[in-house]
Amino acid sequence: DETIERVIRRELESRGWTIGTAESATGGLVGRRLTSLPGASATFRGSVVAYASDLKTSILGVPESTIDEHGVVSEATAEAMALGARAVLGVDVAVAVTGSAGPEPLEQPVGTMIVAVATPTTSMVRTLHLPGDRERVRAYAATGALHLVLRAILDS
């Protein structure tokens, strides 16, 4: 049974890389999925759930000017979260998610989720427009994040 989590772990192990997450709207779902397999500690180092904007700044090092200029739910903030997570967690690959999961919109329409991945050689950012209620949007965003992680690893 080849799950996305297994493929990511195999690709990380083959490179001797580690991974970590910086999550906001998904509340730790990406980290949960990456740690769902036994032996996850071989590649997974940790996760920061920075739900509050001040934590994005104080823990992940997202510049306040980025949040002021672009907003919390922006590609610039997501990329800064991923780059900050690489540094703070000491990982080769970091994935970050921010967004508006609902039920009330936050800067962007409900269902707007932004995923960023930073590796030693590249960074990728994608804006997803997802259907459904809050939990479905969060679950879809976690799946989208894992697919972007795999793509970024394979492109590195």
Task: Please provide the spans of the model-predicted regions.
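Short alpha-helical segments enriched in small residues
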Residues: 1-156
